[in-house]
Amino acid sequence: MLEHGVMKIPGINNVGKTGQAGGETERIPSTEPLGSSAATSPAGPLGGLPARSSSISNTNRTGENPMITPIISSNLGLKHRVTLRKATLASLMQSLSGESSNRVMWNDRYDTLLIARDPREIKNAIEKSVTDFGGLENYKELTGGADPFALMTPVCGLSANNIFKLMTEKDVPIDPTSIEYLENTSFAEHVNTLDSHKNYVVIVNDGRLGHKFLIDLPALTQGPRTAYIIQSDLGGGALPAVRVEDWISRRGSDPVSLDELNQLLSKDFSKMPDDVQTRLLASILQIDKDPHKVDIKKLHLDGKLRFASHEYDFRQFQRNAQYVAGLG
């Protein structure tokens, strides 16, 4: 079926106009959240964390994944919390080179818990779709050459949606494409309403950039609140391409200025001089912080800016990440 000009293939992640898997076309400003469609692939049963199987790779005899830092009390010092956050994200990214972890993490079934996704069922759905299309060659021809069995490098919407789910879900599925986005609301004023003693993640759908990304706002322990960006980018717009693994490795634990974020996500951004716009984009969203790699001529300053925030429990985030990393 066609959705926003993209062929949707039941049961698996889909391929956008760019030829990238994920069913999303980047760099097209829209009033709808990127990745607004949910696939119809089957998923495992809903519920809490599934029992760990001895067949799951990367686990020790306790059933815990040794790559993940042990889950401990949330009453942590700032330095320790920063270290735990960095280790959790690094272990998650490392696991995505594994077939099962990759398929579970970058699936577009948003109506079930991410930790209820079953990699075997996802693979079976892929195989069925390939068969329905008359074989692998026919499938590739109809989807722009995409290999459905290859490890996925997610476009911005797919990575933002799924990491948002991973961070926020506990007992109830959260669909990032169905949540209420704030529009015509000051980002700076909204952040000021958030409880500084709680963790929040903000999902940003920026039509000016044709881009979707996350802002992680860990609980404040002392001093000014810290913000971190989590993103992938297909490229072709104002910013160059970047894989989510590379971003997490190099800048995922690099705090960004809330003052700069407030400027970037303000209505006044479109009125700022070109050099200021370039500097802000490079500082916040360019992996090298290099203004020469920002092309502001590709901005769509009349595009809509929308965002939504959600509280998360860091220990639950660790558990969810541990599930994905333990799949291998």
Swiss-Prot record:
GO molecular function, one term: protein-glutamine glutaminase activity
Annotated catalytic residues: C156, H211, Q231
Keyword Membrane: no
Polar residues bias spans: 52-63
Organism name: Burkholderia pseudomallei (strain K96243)
Residue stretches in coiled coil: none
Pfam families named in the record: CIF
Effect of Q231A: Abolished ability to inhibit the host cell cycle
Domain of life: Bacteria
Entry similarity comment: Belongs to the Cif family.
Purpose of the protein: Protein-glutamine deamidase effector that inhibits the host cell cycle and other key cellular processes such as the actin network and programmed-cell death. Acts by mediating the side chain deamidation of 'Gln-40' of host NEDD8, converting it to glutamate, thereby abolishing the activity of cullin-RING-based E3 ubiquitin-protein ligase complexes (CRL complexes). Inactivation of CRL complexes prevents ubiquitination and subsequent degradation of the cyclin-dependent kinase inhibitors CDKN1A/p21 and CDKN1B/p27, leading to G1 and G2 cell cycle arrests in host cells.
The keyword Acetylation appears for this protein: no
Protein name: Protein-glutamine deamidase Cif
One GO cellular component term noted in the UniProt record for this chain: extracellular region
GO biological process: symbiont-mediated perturbation of host cell cycle progression; symbiont-mediated suppression of host NF-kappaB cascade
Renumbered residue ranges of the record's region Disordered: 1-68
Cellular location(s): Secreted; Host nucleus
Keyword annotations from UniProtKB, A to Z: Host nucleus, Hydrolase, Secreted, Toxin, Virulence
Effect listed in the UniProt record for changing N161A: Impaired ability to mediate deamidation of host NEDD8, leading to decreased ability to inhibit the host cell cycle
Outcome following mutation: T177A: Impaired ability to mediate deamidation of host NEDD8, leading to decreased ability to inhibit the host cell cycle
Reaction catalysed by this enzyme: L-glutaminyl-[protein] + H2O = L-glutamyl-[protein] + NH4(+)
Listed EC numbers: 3.5.1.44
Enzyme superclass (EC): hydrolase
